[in-house]
Amino acid sequence: MTEPLLDSSSDDEPSLVLPENINQPFTTGAEVFGWCLYSWAAEPFIVSVVGTYVPLLLEQIARDNGVKLIDKITPCNQPHDPTIPIPSPPKDGDFPNSTLTYASQNDSCVLPMFGGRFYIDTSSYALYTFSMSVLIQTILVISMSGAADRGSHRKSMLVGFGVTGGLITMCYWLVDDRNYYMASMLAILANSAFGGVNVCGNSFLSLLVNNHPSVRQIHLSKSLKLARMGEISSKISGICAASGYISALLMQIITMLVILHVRNNPNIDSLIYPLKLVIGLVGLWWFVFQLPIQFLLKPRLSKELHVSIEPPDPSKPGYSVNIVRYKMLVVGAYILHGYKTLFSAARAASQLKDIMAFLLGWFIISDSLTTINSTAILFAKSDLQMTTVQLSQIGVLTMISAIAGSVLLPNVIQPYFKLGLKQTMILIIVWASLIPLYGILGFFIRSLGLHHAVEMYVLAIWYGFSLGGVATISRSLYSMLIPPGQESVFFALFSITDKGSSIVGPFLVGLIIDKTHDIRKCFWLLFVFLIAAVPVFWYGIDVDRGINEATVLEHEQDG
């Protein structure tokens, strides 16, 4: 969450108080460098760890501990014990209302959970893990958003979450072939830490812009100041985004080379060792580059949240207990403020039909695009038998294509074809929907439709281009529909929608895999989701109407 670049709230707002030393120092080049460093440090985690290696590790470690679905006794990755009889093939009717053949039953692998109380498909284990991690991350993001936007906590929280996330990711070095619960828990904790870093990092942008020397020196013209702020904001934000992209691409190449080196070592036969090695390296990268932020960024005070209780007197008895109680009350007040901010955003958005339509469409798109990545990675490993090196190469191609999409779509394709933002957004949705549609084609054609590894390379380029394009166009379209002066609260809602949507897709895909033990069937769900977003944008959003409604709402609130 970020504050509005111009704070329109009055200083005598009852729930907020200004600290006495609210005067801010000028933004320096070193501070901008320090802010960009948070993206340089953390972006490889989301691209390499979450996007590539952790899904592979979780699937592999689940398979190493899994058993055959047909008897739930035979280990998946070990030869069958001759003393244990193999069950006879099932007769017709043994699996009523099931789409499974005997062959798919025999090949499928399931993981016993909590002492064998129930079983899940080994491919769905990673999806359930990420669904849970996003749920925890969303709760954390809402709870801490009040502290990230208020007071002097954002710097310490940014560094703290980054260091914690790096250390947790490095703990993958301790995971062995049996620790599938530990591997899953580390993914949940590290992804939650990344969410905290992202919130705190975003909250710095408006402060860096407001206190930039070229902005502070403008006193007479508000319009000129706003224009300069927009220019500086785009410049700083662009540098930060570029540093994250470059860092992620660089780290993806480094980890791929490490895996190549380890694979050629005849003394290493563990399938998860190279995966946990490169995951830990990304954690080390995150940890090392997070530390300089402590010295480069200034605390940047902002309005403190007022707590209607005085701090305890150190001279009175029971001070240690009272100070703990006081700090808990302060933490609770900040958490409550975060949820109040979210409800305020939802209440304001409910008055704007175009904002509501956008958020509904964005919920579907964000969920689908996120789930396509993890589903495709698991499909490539389990069905196409692609190696970790090949999947690393796909990650590199996706990253390069995403950069190209983010540049070419708004700067070349959109102006050349004279497309509006809504039309461009719909074009991207249709473009992305061809990915699961191509996977569905494999049900009917053996020569096409993701039956060969080379097809994954082509789809990686296709997917990356849509990913880079949608990231650029979505924010531009959404920003046009927001009432001026309420950017912070509405982008908070955008962020929560973005994060929260990623709970649904992986969970539903995991259920489909558990029911059918066929990842390809998940492409039907992803295709339907993406196509469902088209009418939401086509019929639900009128950009001119949205701008007018936002302006009217702004005037009503000012009045």
Swiss-Prot record:
Task: Give the top-rank taxon of the lineage listed in the UniProt record for this protein.
Answer: Eukaryota
Report the subcellular localization. Answer: Vacuole membrane
Q: Which GO terms describe its biological process?
A: amino acid transmembrane export from vacuole; autophagy
Q: Which GO terms describe its cellular component?
A: vacuolar membrane
Offer one Pfam family short name for this entry: ATG22
Matching entries from Gene3D superfamilies are given as: MFS general substrate transporter like domains
Keyword annotations = Amino-acid transport, Autophagy, Glycoprotein, Membrane, Transmembrane, Transmembrane helix, Transport, Vacuole
List the membrane topology term(s): Multi-pass membrane protein
Residues bearing attached sugar chains per UniProt: N97, N106
* Transmembrane region(s): 32-52, 126-146, 156-176, 181-201, 239-259, 277-297, 358-378, 393-413, 425-445, 453-473, 493-513, 523-543
- What family does this chain come from, according to its entry? Belongs to the ATG22 family.
Functional description taken from the UniProt entry: Vacuolar effluxer which mediate the efflux of amino acids resulting from autophagic degradation. The release of autophagic amino acids allows the maintenance of protein synthesis and viability during nitrogen starvation.
What name goes with this protein? Autophagy-related protein 22
Q: Name its species.
A: Pichia angusta (Yeast)
Q: Which gene encodes it?
A: ATG22
